[in-house]
Amino acid sequence: MDISHHKMLGKPNWGKQKQTLALMHKARDEGIPVICDQYPYTCNMTTLNACMTPWYFANGFHAMTDQLKDKDFRAKLKAEMEDPATPYDNYYLNAGGWGGVYVYSASKTPEAEGHFITEYADSIGKDPWEAFFDMCVANNCETGGVYSSMCDEDVCEIIRDPTASWAATV
């Protein structure tokens, strides 16, 4: 068994690598070949829309973009994203909020690229939520983000484990 990109994503999971590594060692002791890889950094990268509740994308990016133009929908989505009980892998909360979400791609709003959402919002004089939603609308929800969602100690412990190797997605 190969566990690819073994990580503890999001603050609620920090420290749980002790349990997962113990399970891997137990399996190996029982004759099950288990290995893993981990990239040597504390961020994960995907689209910025990954931090929004996924069920609103059922009709595609264009439909979601249209919904994001409505202030009542924005308020509903914000409440869902801020609620840890909302049942989805919440990248916004995993990153500790907008201060941990970095924009690497936003072709229609290039001034956002290279900045955390909070920095970008400050630079344009907007609330981070408004800046995020406006950027998503301008880019038809086709943006890229980097999420600061892991801690150094967890990453280092996994990499030091004899079952692990380094990996990188390029």
Please give the residue ranges for each predicted region.
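Active-site neighborhoods of metal-dependent hydrolases
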Residues: 4-170
